[in-house]
Amino acid sequence: MLTFQQMILTLQAYWDRQGCALLQPIDLEVGAGTSHVHTFLRAIGPEPWRAAYVQPSRRPKDGRYGENPNRLQHYYQYQVVLKPAPENILELYLGSLEALGLDLKQNDIRFVEDDWENPTLGAWGLGWEVWLNGMEVTQFTYFQQVGGIDCKPITGEITYGIERLAMYLQKVENIYDLVWTEWQENGETRRLTYGDVYHQNEVEQSTYNFEHSNTEILFRHFAEHESEAKRLMGDTGEKAEGAQEKAAGTRLALPAYEQVLKAAHTFNLLDARGAISVTERAAYIGRIRNLSRQVAQAYYDSREALGFPMCKTEARA
């Protein structure tokens, strides 16, 4: 039996053999691996890219106080990004399942059409859910647009739901019973479970998300992150002659994107708290999307100004 951490190590080794850079998770709260700078921004422009990483993901509304056996407000995704998407991407994915010990002939693996969209990132793609014996374990996406910019070439994204896949491999019904790791000590097998690591976190974070987050502070933080992102994009709000031109020459896409991610997580906390109405929700999503598009364009422009250097690297190779 593969432990939870052995699963991750196996996927790391497999995708390393496929030429992926094994990266670390982004050190900010995000709702999915797609929000990582090395997926969202790297999907923009012509430069090739192959990367894989684990991404802790937070979705405050999904918290259930640690009482639901398969629903969490904090969980893990294993993210693989291949640009351009190789013709054999499905075969590569199935190979990763075999590396995890799955017999493809003995299991019902289905690709169910499910196109993907992330409104806050101004991103969408064509894709499939992957069902393993009736349970969704992976999302496949061919990015068509990111930040409102057409993807040329197309980026292929594979997002594994690590906990769900582990539940099947370990044959457990409750996520908290997953074996995170096990070892021998004094002749006995010792185990650390998912619940040992994260159950208290689910209880307390759910309590915070739904009951104790300070909405006044969160609204202020959202406005601050939005304002800072705009400033870093050269939108100073000043009308003085030359002010906008000066600011436009110092657009900082990467720091601005971090502010966008912070604004997005703050919005998710407010949404979980029930502090945003249905009509306000659409407006907030639109504000974040507009920022994402500005960042995407600024990043594209900066790479273009550099001559898309990774295209040259690939040509030399």
UniProtKB/Swiss-Prot annotation:
EC number: 6.1.1.14
Matches recorded under InterPro entries: aa-tRNA-synth_II/BPL/LPL, Gly-tRNA-synth_heterodimer, Gly-tRNA_ligase_asu
Key words of the record: Aminoacyl-tRNA synthetase, ATP-binding, Cytoplasm, Ligase, Nucleotide-binding, Protein biosynthesis
Listed GO biological process terms: glycyl-tRNA aminoacylation
Compartments (UniProt record): Cytoplasm
Keyword Nuclease belongs to the record: no
CC terms in the record's Gene Ontology section: cytosol
Coiled coil as UniProt keyword: no
Pfam families: tRNA-synt_2e
Catalytic reaction annotation: tRNA(Gly) + glycine + ATP = glycyl-tRNA(Gly) + AMP + diphosphate
Gene3D superfamilies per UniProt: Bira Bifunctional Protein, Domain 2 (3.30.930.10), Class II aaRS and biotin synthetases, domain 2 (1.20.58.180)
Primary subcellular site in the record, as a coarse category: cytoplasm
Enzyme class: ligase
UniProt GO MF annotations: ATP binding; glycine-tRNA ligase activity
Membership in a protein family: Belongs to the class-II aminoacyl-tRNA synthetase family.
Oligomer status and interactors: Tetramer of two alpha and two beta subunits.
Entry protein name: Glycine--tRNA ligase alpha subunit
Native species: Cupriavidus metallidurans (strain ATCC 43123 / DSM 2839 / NBRC 102507 / CH34) (Ralstonia metallidurans)
